[in-house]
A protein has these predicted regions:
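Short, well-structured N-terminal submotif of metal-dependent ribonuclease cores
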Residues: 1-33, 44, 49-56
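Extended beta-strand/beta-hairpin segments
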Residues: 2-6, 91, 122
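Phosphate- and divalent-cation-binding pockets in alpha/beta enzyme and binding domains
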Residues: 13-14, 36, 78, 116-117
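Residue-level signal for well-ordered alpha-helical positions
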Residues: 17-18, 40, 120-121
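Alpha-helix boundary recognition
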Residues: 23, 60-64, 84, 101, ...
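Active-site-proximal, substrate-binding regions of enzyme catalytic domains
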Residues: 32, 36-79
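Acidic, PIN/NYN-like endoribonuclease modules and their adjacent C-terminal/linker elements
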Residues: 34, 97-131
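Active-site neighborhoods of divalent-metal-dependent phosphate/nucleic-acid chemistry enzymes
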Residues: 67-113
Length: 131
């Protein structure tokens, strides 16, 4: 079983495309995933990109995804260290990277710039690896 850390962009795409993740994989994410996906969908509604009922349907699909959410003190401490190491003011992305280091085989993100910035720190995989 391959363990993947998935970020909010990946989860939102999986929900919008109604993709079923292979049962051969285990998905992990920091607890902040809930707030990030909620906010991203609300913002999309406010910008007129999607209807509110579509956003709520995607939130329901996200809530049913078998993603193990983690946010313990060890993760937070490692995220802080990584943010310092990488020169990031925010620890949001560092939480995903830290979780990958601590518990997963690879990190899946749609953010090409983020993926480049963590080369050599954690392995990354494409969203297609989840199918």
């Amino acid at each position: 079983m391959t363990k993947f850390v998935v970020d909010a962009g990946v989860v939102l795409q999986l929900a919008s495309e109604e993709v079923e993740v292979s049962g051969a994989h285990k998905l992990l994410a920091p607890t902040l995933l809930r707030s990030q996906t909620l906010s991203a969908l609300h913002e999309a509604v406010q910008r007129g990109e999607i209807e509110a009922d579509v956003a709520r349907d995607r939130l329901t699909r996200i809530g049913k995804m078998p993603i193990r959410l983690l946010g313990d003190a060890v993760l937070r401490r490692r995220a802080w260290e990584l943010a310092d190491q990488l020169g990031w003011a925010s620890t949001y992305n560092a939480e995903y990277v830290a979780l990958t280091q601590l518990q997963a085989d690879a990190f899946v993100t749609l953010d090409a710039e983020l993926a480049r910035s963590i080369e050599g720190i954690v392995p990354t995989a494409s969203i297609d690896a989840l199918r």
